[in-house]
């Protein structure tokens, strides 16, 4: 059973204890329960800080972590299958799997985005190792990667460059958009990116606490604010947007209009609680997998029957079309921790 979400956020730059936010609302508690000790790690292995997680077409789960093996495959029952990509990674960050079951990693230590086949062989390198953004096609601590319906590659070049970079399916640079800032089309740490079936690009503008939505050419369409801190985004087959909120340590489901449909989770160290909910993935049976950074673990949450309970007090989403919101972005903390 999940406890109600706390009013006090588990985030250094968020609302102070005792502060009140008139936008807070109660929403349905999503029907998920934690599956304790789902992953059976090899003897002697501790995950360390966890970062990325993804699921392939067979339901196998791939975990990206900051201890060896940094990239590992587990079957649908949580049993270890193999380690992959030994020696390829510096500081693992994001992990995605494309329609052909290729693995894509973002590494904010080496400034690289890698495409690997299911056996861990390198197929494509974007960026240049240990080189920041000296050219349009280079990155400065890239955070996440996503794919368009025609194979386009979108990189959230997050920690250093505050932009989105677009490549064609073969890795040729096409364009980029965004810069550091608070306005429309600007970012304060674009930490995650996802693309829906219509080609719209969703960017989790983490420290501005919003999701900005663009067309495939980077033209601004709208934004959703008041949703917390978007650390990771996943778009489900029904086109709902799922978000890890690493500031309040919860999982949120939104519809295509930006309405919050439900949430679950809370900050803490017990099973089912989280400390920096980073990235997430959804399995074919609707199990949700979460990289729980500071707890040094990956957690699995199984879907259950609806409970009818409410997950109390999360920010209400507000959608803006083509204009900036009238909220105090300038008051936000701008020192960005690497997480």
Give names to the regions the model predicted:
Residues 11-13:
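Hydrophobic single-pass membrane-insertion segments
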Residues 15-339:
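Eukaryotic scaffold repeat domains enriched in small/polar residues
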Residues 1-9:
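Bacterial N-terminal signal peptides
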């Amino acid at each position: 059973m999940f406890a109600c979400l706390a009013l006090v956020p588990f985030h250094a730059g968020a609302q102070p204890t005792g502060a009140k936010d008139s936008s807070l609302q109660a929403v349905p508690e999503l029907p998920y329960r934690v599956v304790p000790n789902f992953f059976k790690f090899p003897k002697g292995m501790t995950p360390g800080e966890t970062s990325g997680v993804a699921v392939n077409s067979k339901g196998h789960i791939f975990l990206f972590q900051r201890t060896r093996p940094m990239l590992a495959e587990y079957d649908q029952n949580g049993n270890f299958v193999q380690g992959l990509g030994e020696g390829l990674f510096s500081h693992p960050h994001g992990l995605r799997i494309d329609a052909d079951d290729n693995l894509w990693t973002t590494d904010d230590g080496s400034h690289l985005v890698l495409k690997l086949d299911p056996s861990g062989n390198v197929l494509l390198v974007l960026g240049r190792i240990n080189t920041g953004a000296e050219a349009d096609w280079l990155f400065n601590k890239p955070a996440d990667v996503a794919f368009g319906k025609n194979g386009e590659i979108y990189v959230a070049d997050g920690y250093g460059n505050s932009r989105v970079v677009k490549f064609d399916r073969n890795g040729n640079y096409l364009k980029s958009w965004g810069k550091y800032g608070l306005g429309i089309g600007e970012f304060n740490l674009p930490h995650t990116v996802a693309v829906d079936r219509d080609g719209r690009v969703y960017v989790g503008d983490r420290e501005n606490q919003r999701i900005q939505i663009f067309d495939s050419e980077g033209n601004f369409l709208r934004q959703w604010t008041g949703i917390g801190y978007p650390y990771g985004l996943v778009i489900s087959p029904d086109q709902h947007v799922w978000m890890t909120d690493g500031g309040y340590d919860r999982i949120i489901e939104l519809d295509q209009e930006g309405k919050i449909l439900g949430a679950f989770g809370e900050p803490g160290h017990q099973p089912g609680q989280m400390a920096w909910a980073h990235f997430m993935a959804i399995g074919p049976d609707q199990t949700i997998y979460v990289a729980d950074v500071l707890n040094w673990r990956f957690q699995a949450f199984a879907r259950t029957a609806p409970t009818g309970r409410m997950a109390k007090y999360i920010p209400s989403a507000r959608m803006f079309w083509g204009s900036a919101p009238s909220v105090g972005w300038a008051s936000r903390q701008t020192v960005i921790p690497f997480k």
